[in-house]
Structures are given as structure tokens and as C-alpha cells.
Amino acid sequence: MTFDVRKILEQLDTGTPAEAGVPGWQQQSWEDPDGFANALAVAHVGKGAPLKSRAGQHYDFFHDLVVRHANTDKIALRAYDKRAGWQVLGYKQLQEQASRRATEWTQQGVKAGAKVCLVYSVGNELLISLAAALCVGACVSFLPPTGRRFIAKRLAALGPDHIATEPHQLLLLEGFEKQVLQHKGKGSPAFTSHTYKPVEPLGLLFSPLVEPSGTPAPLVAEDAWRGALVDGLLTFGLGAGEHLAAPGYHPLQHVPALLFATLLRGATYLHLELSDVEVNPALITEHPVRALGVTPALRDVLLKARTPLKNVAHWFRNPEEPIDWHAWRTWVKECALAAVPSANVLVDPSAGGAVLTTPRRVRDLHVEAFPAPGRRWELHDINLSGQPAPGDLGIFTLVPPDKRPPGYLILTRSYGLYHYGGPRTARRVGRVYPAAEVAEAVQGLPFVRGATVVPAPTGGVAGHYRYVLLVFTGAQARQPGPWLQEIRKSIELQLGAEHLPDRVDFIPLYPRKVDGQLDEAWCQTEYMTGALFRKSADPLFQALTALRGHLLEKGGPNV
């Protein structure tokens, strides 16, 4: 098939579709992703330096993402620091520092194919180490420095050969100190970058979309490169030197995909912590933003401050976020975005980038979500039989399915359009909630006699749930205030604040146990039917609980 990339870009930039529904070129790209990638690669270079990568043959990420732009004054990363203000990392500086770090790493035994886990917050050090890992040819993994239990479980599952982090994060890496790489900045910058084969693993990523939680999912080089190519050029429409920003976007879901898309275009990733925007919403307006990712939390902050976003060329949202129609429409009106194009964009890190998108257009809020350009996909039976969906509703599945994590979201097709239909099972904004880890994190508290997490449907938009932590406290005198503080503190320290449950219910009963383990199915059924609530208020069950407490806890709560 022939793809006229110039016309495609004109359609996307003007927001004027040539036809209703999914554009014809996008449907053709699903059938011929190889031809589509080749056409994009030619158009992508434009007047810039040529790519070393060849679609379907080999991929030199370090050259195409970093070296190609190093002879310019372009900025790779612009990040805000609450103490020092805006900090920048240029492509030239990135190349030099990453090359030195790659040399240091090879002297410490890092080889092509080695599993290197990057434990960083988003910032200069992450970008330098990511580029160094690509230069060496490592298989990259990424973990933000959250809680100890969260990191320890994932490092144990990954079994990394090496870990790169900053010195002040070493306390989070107990048991893995021997794998930590040293950074002295004394390596030679002369280093020949690695070329990945198409099916060579470039990453093992802890995608929050993969079940069970904490399972590393492979990202092959071809998916990473094509994802960056399509997203940089089409999804976000980035040009050299333009900014992509996504404050508050989940790092495990969007790193490294957003970074790859930005760097391949020679653009600038604008990093802002949501907490900094809450303090000073005007920060988001200090630089022109080509593409702005907006979460409900960022929307509410900007709406409260009535911040006019005249510097934003277009914005996008994750279709898996709860959709408050009134709040979104009010935000668009109050922040001067009524004439600004928008899109829905869902990123899957193990697929290398966006898997569901819509063209950038000036229009009202919607739940449309088209399979991304250049992706082979199918609708599968929602019963997970593996057969194609018999109708126009099914599980969105990337092809070939046997080499990828199982699909989880429902896509519907109607009158030539595709709509997001929610996840097949309970999730939080499409992400797997680590319910077992949350329960384990509070199980050791002295007042806890049992804990489990129950997902409860919200009753609103399909597929949205609230997670309720049930804490059984037995016959103890109730102290909900202090208990809640201890629970929050324990979860934040061990797993990170993002994993706090939506609600905590203290149950003044003893849970049912089978072979010494909490019967989670019983707990969920009793809670959802209201039986636990009724028993808690029943004088008979209160007396039985007091008697059981007297008998069981003579030697301590675990007797």
C-alpha cells in the first residue's frame, strides 16, 4: 500500500478529517504496518540528520534518539525543581554524559542484553542512565523510588544483573546492594552504540496494565521504535524543539514510551510534578506546549486557579480515566481551550507506545478510541476463549497475542467508530491494583487481625471501581482515627501513596480463615451483601467476638 504522509500530517494538523469515522489511511495502516512504518521513517527525517535504524532490520536507539540531535542547541529535558527552578539537559550534554556512563558501566561488567533496572524519579539522571543503557544495548527496566516492599518484590521478580540509581536511594535497595552501579563521571565519551535486532528485548517493564501486578513484561526493539515513530510524528505531532508535557501521568505506564517519542523527534520533554503545579499553576504556562497530557487531578488544579492555557497547541486524556462530563466541559471553557484540538490516548508500555488514539480535533468530550495507526489487532471473545469476537464487541488484542500480555479492555464498534468500553475485570483507571500487596502491608500492624481488599463498582461510567480495604480488628476497643493514620503511613512507606485504598472499613469481628489463611472469597461476599455490617451491630455477634477475643488473644493476637 502507498501512504501519502504529507496529506496525513495535513489532516491531523488542521483537524479536518477527509471522511467520517476512522480515516482510510489509518485502516490501511492496520493491514500493512510494515509499509506504514517505512513511509513514516522517510517522512520523519525531513531536513534533519538521517536515521541509522531500518524498519524491520535493526535499530540504533542511542544514535536516533540522542546522537542525531547532539550537534544542535536543542533541549532534551526541561524539568522544574522547587529549589532551583527550571533545569535543562541539552542533547549535546546528554550524549556526552550518557557515553561516559556507558563506558563506566562496561568497565563494571555491563554487557549487551544485561538486565539493568533504573531506579529514579523522572529527571536528568533517569534520562542519562536510560540513554547509557541504550548505548550499551541493555535490556532496560524502570522503577520509580516509591516504597521498599513495592521495589523489593519487583526486583526479586526481575532478577536484575545491574541496578542504576542515585546514592540517596540505596536504602530502598536492601538485599541488592551488590548489583548497584557506580557513577563517577570519569569514563571516556567515545563509545560505539549498540544496534538492536527487531525481536531483541529492549526492556522488561513493570507495566501496571499487566496482571498479576509486579510481573515484568517484555518490550521488543521493533515495538519500541515503531511506537516512538508513530507517537512522535502523528499521535502528539511533535516537531524539533517543541514540548511534550504530562504532569501527573503514571510513570510506570508512560516511561519510557513518552520519552522515546519525544527524543526521536528532537523535541523536549517538559517535566512537572503535579505537586508543584498545585502550588503554582502558572508553571504550566511558562513554556509553549505542543502536546499536554491532562489527568482529572491536573484538570481540577487548573480549573480552580482559572489558568488560561493559551500556550497549549493541543491536549490529550487517557480514555480509562473516569469521565466527569461537567468538570471537563467547564475546564475547557474556563481555561480557554474551546478552540484547541484534543484527543484520547491510551499508552501501553509493553507495546512501546499508544495503542488506542483518536485524531486531534476541536470537538466535545467523547469516549471514542481507535486502534492506533500501524498496529495489528483483533477483537477477541470476552470469555477469553481466544476466538475472534462474534459481534462488534470484544477484547482489544494486539497481534500476535501469544507474544504479548493478555488483553483486558473492551472495545466496541458501531457505525464505523470504536468506543472504549471499560476493562473486563476490576481495575483502577485501567491499571491493576496490587490488592494482595496492600493487605500484606498492613497485616503486621498490632491492631490488625486480618485484612483484604474488595473492589466495589462505582455505579458511574462502566469499568470504574473503588477499592475498599477491610481491616478486621476483633474484640479491641475501636480507635479509628489513630488506626487510619498508621495504615496510611504503612502503605505510603512500603508501597507509595498512589496505592492507598479509596476507603478503609474497620470490622469489629474476626475474619474467617481456612488453613490459617484469610478466606478472601468469604470476606468479599460478606461485605458486598452487607452481612459484615449487620453482624457488627448484632448483640449476639458482639458477644461472640468478645468471647473469642478472650480465648484467642491470651497469648497475643496471632494465637
Give the predicted meaning of each segment.
Residues 63, 76-114, 119-127, 150-152, ...:
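Conserved AMP-binding/adenylate-forming core of the ANL superfamily
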Residues 73-75, 181-228, 234-244, 337, ...:
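Conserved pre-ATP/AMP-binding loop-to-beta segment of ANL
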Residues 143, 163, 285, 292, ...:
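AMP-binding/adenylate-forming catalytic core of the ANL superfamily
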Residues 193, 202-205, 264-267, 290-293, ...:
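Gly/Ser/Thr-rich phosphate-binding loop
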Residues 376-402, 413-415, 479-480, 484:
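Conserved beta-loop-beta connector loops within the AMP-binding
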Residues 452, 492-559:
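Conserved C-terminal "lid"/linker of ANL adenylate-forming enzymes
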